[in-house]
Regions:
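N-terminal accessory segment detector
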Residues: 1-79, 83-103, 114-158
Length: 158
């Protein structure tokens, strides 16, 4: 069963509203994790064993694979982009993006992986999010998340 695009897109403004307000952090994480769990139930997400399968299963959770293309697989990492226009785009609110992407981190937990946003649409001039996925048991210490990089004042990914 496909998640209807209209339903998926209706969730985005609610997610942005919560994630844009740091004082709502107590509610944002459970909300995003709950929405991800609901998506996983509707789409019948299954744990995967290889990093390629993890990337493909993450893609399958969206209304269209075209909006979340896998751009490459290197060693233990799947790279992908998120082409859905984010309301955080260009705002500089990379922390809000991080809170909102709890949705994807929860999905990756359920399918056996980890999720890191490398570049966020919230950063000035960035039009697509660049993300990385690895199996749950593979360290991600070498991947610098966008919100950490932005906090350091470095807007160029490593």
């Amino acid at each position: 069963m496909r998640v209807p695009k209209q339903l998926f897109m209706a969730i985005v403004p609610v997610s942005v509203w919560f994630s844009s307000r740091p004082w709502l952090n107590f509610a944002t994480r459970p909300l995003m994790r709950g929405l991800a769990a609901a998506t996983m139930r509707v789409r019948k997400a299954q744990p995967q064993t290889t990093v390629e399968e993890i990337g493909e299963e993450w893609q399958r959770m969206f209304p269209s694979r075209k909006v979340v293309p896998i751009t490459g697989v290197e060693n233990d990492t799947v790279y992908a982009e998120i082409h859905i226009t984010c309301p955080h785009r260009g705002t500089g609110n990379v922390e809000g993006c991080y809170r909102m992407m709890e949705y994807d981190r929860k999905m990756l937990e359920g399918i056996g992986g980890q999720f890191v946003v490398l570049r966020s649409q919230a950063e000035p001039g960035v039009e697509v999010c660049q993300v990385a996925m690895r199996k749950a048991d593979v360290p991600v210490d070498d991947l610098v998340p966008a919100h950490v990089r932005a906090r350091r004042g470095n807007l160029e990914p490593s």
